[in-house]
Amino acid sequence: MATVNTDATDKDISKFKVTFTLVVSGIECITGILGSGFITAIYGAEWARGKTLPTGDRIMLMLSFSRLLLQIWMMLENICSLLFRIVYNQNSVYILFKVITVFLNHSNLWFAAWLKVFYCLRIANFNHPLFFLMKRKIIVLMPWLLRLSVSVSLSFSFPLSRDVFNVYVNSSIPIPSSNSTEKKYFSETNMVNLVFFYNMGIFVPLIMFILAATLLILSLKRHTLHMGSNATGSRDPSMKAHIGAIKATSYFLILYIFNAIALFLSMSNIFDTYSSWNILCKIIMAAYPAGHSVQLILGNPGLRRAWKRFQHQVPLYLKGQTL
């Protein structure tokens, strides 16, 4: 059975690494919590008032709510793993964190993939019968596809609670040339089971996201070249919007892939627990949902207007509280 074994002591992580990781990932998580929380509040309020949300807004509501939970959970895990290492390295606690992290990440990747597929079908133009069929059916099928995504994420996350991770703490490791002892944290990861369940849970949404993003970029690029050939000029607002959409889609396609890779590397314990590479994985995992949430707000006219109203109302509210 292929396993990865790692061990670490309290001396392996410096105060600088702890502070750096908590500050950087904390800023990312708080940014993501504010962004995802804002989107959830806007669309959640409309849904609570009995309004029927359009399909795109419904996907964004589910994506933002799951990201809100994910970023809160990631921040909690970072605090626990760095400041309360003995508690975190209890097998039941460690497995609980990993299973929920994978479930929330898989759900997020599925929802992000469906959002990209939906926008691709709405915006892109391709003369293919399958594309036209999906264009007509996507609104009807989307509620069922979102529910199926949650079920699939759960199905490939829960098995990670058995025969994948094993961690323990030995508090009686003797220190050479000293009469004292130190704590040592051991972890074992069954790579065969992890690779199987992780890849099964992420393979389909990853391919969907890459395919939808690529088709969207090609369609927008083709339309932009057509506009350029008609001498509309690079200053045309429509062309600028298309170029901006191409850049945003390209950036988040790359970040989406890096996030999936970072999640796997972090889960597999290939790197030492407190190594710089593992810290980098944590930062990437926190950066993607935070950055995408901000981009969703800035790229959506309705959310952008709501954010400006919110920014205007907060100082007025704080001023009223001080009176």
Swiss-Prot record:
Family designation: Belongs to the G-protein coupled receptor T2R family.
Other facts noted in the record for this chain: Several bitter taste receptors are expressed in a single taste receptor cell.
Function: Gustducin-coupled receptor implicated in the perception of bitter compounds in the oral cavity and the gastrointestinal tract. Signals through PLCB2 and the calcium-regulated cation channel TRPM5.
UniProt GO molecular function: bitter taste receptor activity; G protein-coupled receptor activity
Record-annotated membrane-spanning stretches: 15-35, 59-79, 101-121, 141-162, 191-211, 248-268, 277-297
Glycosylated residues, chain numbering: 170, 179
Membrane protein topology class: Multi-pass membrane protein
Source species taxonomy: Eukaryota, Metazoa, Chordata, Craniata, Vertebrata
InterPro entries for the chain: TAS2R
Name of the gene encoding the protein in the UniProt record: TAS2R40
Alphabetical list of PANTHER family matching this protein: TASTE RECEPTOR TYPE 2 (PTHR11394), TASTE RECEPTOR TYPE 2 MEMBER 40 (PTHR11394:SF47)
Protein name: Taste receptor type 2 member 40
Positions on the Cytoplasmic side per record topology: 36-58, 122-140, 212-247, 298-323
Keywords, ordered alphabetically: G-protein coupled receptor, Glycoprotein, Membrane, Receptor, Sensory transduction, Taste, Transducer, Transmembrane, Transmembrane helix
Alphabetical list of SUPFAM superfamilies matching this protein: Family A G protein-coupled receptor-like
Species this chain originates from: Gorilla gorilla gorilla
